[in-house]
Amino acid sequence: MKEDYRAALKKTLCTWLGTTRLSLELTQDRMAEILLIDVRSYADIDRGISMCSTLTFVLFLVYLCPEPVTLLKEIRARFDIIRNGME
């Protein structure tokens, strides 16, 4: 069950990070710098290979995310689907 939530979160964040980076016309290097992580770590998150840390997620919400509330609602909707499927 926990892995289902993690997979949904990873997929959502991968999409949002990539879309945001492209819309802001930032390189992976610049995104990594803003998020205080190395470029390889960012690239792995961007490709959906790795999950970001809590700090990285909060830095993204605070400094880069164009619609933080929308992102959180999307995560909640995905979590609700998982939760409802298990009841």
Predicted regions span which residues?
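Short alpha-helical DNA-recognition segment
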Residues: E25-D44
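Residues within the helices of the helix-turn-helix
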Residues: G18, D29, V58
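Alpha-helical residues within the helix-turn-helix
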Residues: L22, E33, V62
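DNA major-groove recognition helix of helix-turn-helix/homeodomain DNA-binding modules
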Residues: S53-L71
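A short, Lys/Arg-rich alpha-helix, primarily the initiator
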Residues: M1-S23
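Short, charged recognition helix plus adjacent turn
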Residues: V69-E87
